Amino acid sequence: MSEYSLFTSESVSEGHPDKIADQISDAVLDAIIAQDKYARVACETLVKTGVAIIAGEVTTSAWVDLEELVRKVIIDIGYNSSDVGFDGATCAVMNIIGKQSVDIAQGVDRSKPEDQGAGDQGLMFGYASNETDVLMPAPICFSHRLVERQAEARKSGLLPWLRPDAKSQVTCRYENGRVVGIDAVVLSTQHNPEVSQKDLQEAVMELIVKHTLPAELLHKGTQYHINPTGNFIIGGPVGDCGLTGRKIIVDSYGGMARHGGGAFSGKDPSKVDRSAAYAGRYVAKNIVAAGLAERCEIQVSYAIGVAQPTSISINTFGTGKVSDDKIVQLVRECFDLRPYAITKMLDLLHPMYQETAAYGHFGRTPQQKTVGDDTFTTFTWERTDRAQALRDAAGL
């Protein structure tokens, strides 16, 4: 981080229209993969006033009542009345999902599972930094926590006049690669019309901002912008059209690391846009946890239908204890980054994805979860179980 003195990242709540779309797409994936682990799913969602549209390509033996599922996701988020502008119980739901192209299938499917080809060409990045306890950049961590707290305050009834749509933004000040302060906080939250701006700003400041952000990083010069435009009554899909895959920087590292451009939500693990990005995070986090570097960014790339990555590259930004070339060699020794091997390594064939679709895919805590008779661990790419093997291989 030494090249920046200030860095800003943003996040959005689960009620933001683009995040509604992401959560619907991943709910569809989860419902299908719960019945058919090897299904091929690519589900895109659009939400706008009074309508939710799901489209894409799915090949599966599962049967899911997709209309009911879409409605449940929308209602669970908090859009359950026309008073808030969008109602999952009464909105139109349109399903235009088709089957996966046979041309793609022939490039992915193999008689030997380990030879499974990548579902598309592309490049993916993973990143980790030791500036926070979860080895993530601080600005995106703090931004996620603000909107997560907003949802908690809304759903618990602590601030009952809050509505689902919200956005946050945090600017951190760095010195010698360490966060030394928060210079600016922006939080815009949708609300009921009866609450005054004064009451809203005071409550949000005390019960969301100060409750969430580390007090030692807030200072007399910190700027606070709470609903800076005034009223935010009209929000969600009424205020803006929502689409799957439009919050890829929110989903990843808040702009601190590069991004290959591929979105995550609605895609089964055969799509390397998702699985290889998760593997990239797993590799980078273990490198930092092992003490091989303070910061690490990995890029992997693939060709459609080919199992082995076409490239693996590492950048430790001058913080490495060994050379970047040596770390690439260690990665090749300790991690199998073929698509099938990633799926096996991270145990990805479970209905774990809707939870990833709000508040970031990275920096989360693995939890054991049971769906039906399937018990599994979520966020497996956040484990640091290969750090010691990397240290040993590096001779540290």
Swiss-Prot record:
Protein name: S-adenosylmethionine synthase
Positions bound to L-methionine: E57, Q100, D240, K271
Annotated residues for binding of K(+): E44
Subcellular location: Cytoplasm
GO biological process, one term: one-carbon metabolic process
Residues that coordinate or bind Mg(2+): D18
Entry's family note: Belongs to the AdoMet synthase family.
Species assigned in the record: Pseudomonas entomophila (strain L48)
Cofactor requirements of the protein: Mg(2+); K(+)
UniProt-listed Pfam families: S-AdoMet_synt_C (PF02773), S-AdoMet_synt_M (PF02772), S-AdoMet_synt_N (PF00438)
SUPFAM superfamilies attached to this UniProt entry: S-adenosylmethionine synthetase
Catalytic activity: L-methionine + ATP + H2O = S-adenosyl-L-methionine + phosphate + diphosphate
Subunit note: Homotetramer; dimer of dimers.
Function: Catalyzes the formation of S-adenosylmethionine (AdoMet) from methionine and ATP. The overall synthetic reaction is composed of two sequential steps, AdoMet formation and the subsequent tripolyphosphate hydrolysis which occurs prior to release of AdoMet from the enzyme.
Cofactor mode of binding and number, as noted: Binds 2 divalent ions per subunit. Binds 1 potassium ion per subunit.
InterPro entries in UniProt: ADOMET_SYNTHASE_CS (IPR022631), S-AdoMet_synt_C (IPR022630), S-AdoMet_synt_central (IPR022629), S-AdoMet_synt_N (IPR022628), S-AdoMet_synthetase (IPR002133), S-AdoMet_synthetase_sfam (IPR022636)
Cellular component annotations (GO), alphabetically ordered: cytoplasm
A GO MF label: magnesium ion binding
Gene3D superfamilies: 3.30.300.10
Gene (UniProt): metK
Top-level taxon of origin: Bacteria
Pathway: Amino-acid biosynthesis; S-adenosyl-L-methionine biosynthesis; S-adenosyl-L-methionine from L-methionine: step 1/1
Keyword ATP-binding: yes
Keyword Signal among record annotations: no
Residue sites binding ATP per the record: H16, D165, A166, K167, D240, R246, K247, A263, K267
